[in-house]
Amino acid sequence: MFLAADRPTTDLPADLPAAIAALKQELNAVILAHYYQEAAIQDVADYIGDSLGLSRQAAAADADVIVFAGVHFMAETAKILNPQRQVLLPDLAAGCSLADSCPPEAFAAFKAAHPNHIVISYINCTAEIKALSDIICTSSNAVKIVQQIPVDQPIIFAPDRNLGRYVMQQTGRDLVLWDGSCIVHETFSEQRLLELQARHPDAEIIAHPECETPVLDQARFIGSTTALLNYSLNSPSREFIVVTEPGIIHQMQQAAPEKTFIPAPPQDTTCACNECPFMRLNTLEKLYLCMRDRRPEIQIPEETRLAALRPIERMLAMSA
């Protein structure tokens, strides 16, 4: 497999943001970046958002080239929605622990063991899992989508068990959960969170629903990255403990410089485990190189793409 990281980084232009802007014009490209990307990438992106927002931007894109600064499943989603456009990912190794926790063959067997269930899959999954699903959801719209399903219709929810438990709690529905999780959101602990809050008693705890239940129980507000951003801007509080990947704090600080945003620490204080190692594989240098060389490019077999497109389109229609 060819990786952006395999290329030499010599002869890079001195002003990478300017060079990226020039390439964007030359290629008629649009740069989409997730909130968890490093600040330098966010600063050159055309659109910054969560999975739902970026899916909508990808669906509406009129550029010839979509450069996706995120992880592999996000770039796949852009390609599923835009088969006629070139979709580039700065580093093909930028995967996802949650997506990896749900192998297609095992999930197909799991689905077969639960006949008459519809499958709602979190967008953090591979194209193959999307193709096995009936509806896709994001952390922004998962509750809303489940609420639209008839109460007598049994549901499989995959692949994130923590988001699934949160949806069950919010909707009162019983869901059959696939046992997957995100390594970043599982690194937060209730004990470390309470210790931090004791040092910042006026801070509001805001958390992503991929966190485990004991952590969510301590949160004043639970929501997607976009919801966390909006809540922090509209809340009268001046200090927040942010329990998700800390890349989102860049946008929070830019939007509300008068407020203080404290990243929640991981359970293991010897590592930066609250940072997504896959998201951080993308760098400004790799972004430039992928645009310059127009690779690595996302490719999806057409049969898989068409099967994965239908549940994404259902999500977009149900969350309009």
Curated annotation (Swiss-Prot):
Binds 1 [4Fe-4S] cluster per subunit. It is found in: Cytoplasm. InterPro entries: NadA, NadA_sf, Quinolinate_synth_type2. GO terms for cellular component: cytosol. [4Fe-4S] cluster binds at C96, C182, C276. Keywords: 4Fe-4S, Cytoplasm, Iron, Iron-sulfur, Metal-binding, Pyridine nucleotide biosynthesis, Transferase. Iminosuccinate binds at H34, S51, Y122, I123, N124, S139, H208, P209, E210, T225. Its EC number is 2.5.1.72. One of its GO terms (molecular function) is quinolinate synthetase A activity. Its main location: cytoplasm. The keyword Secreted does not apply. It catalyses: iminosuccinate + dihydroxyacetone phosphate = quinolinate + phosphate + 2 H2O + H(+). Its cofactor is [4Fe-4S] cluster. Pathway: Cofactor biosynthesis; NAD(+) biosynthesis; quinolinate from iminoaspartate: step 1/1. GO terms for biological process: 'de novo' NAD biosynthetic process from L-aspartate. Pfam families: NadA. Catalyzes the condensation of iminoaspartate with dihydroxyacetone phosphate to form quinolinate. NCBIfam families: nadA, PRK09375.1-2. Belongs to the quinolinate synthase family. Type 2 subfamily. This is Quinolinate synthase. It comes from Synechococcus elongatus (strain ATCC 33912 / PCC 7942 / FACHB-805) (Anacystis nidulans R2).
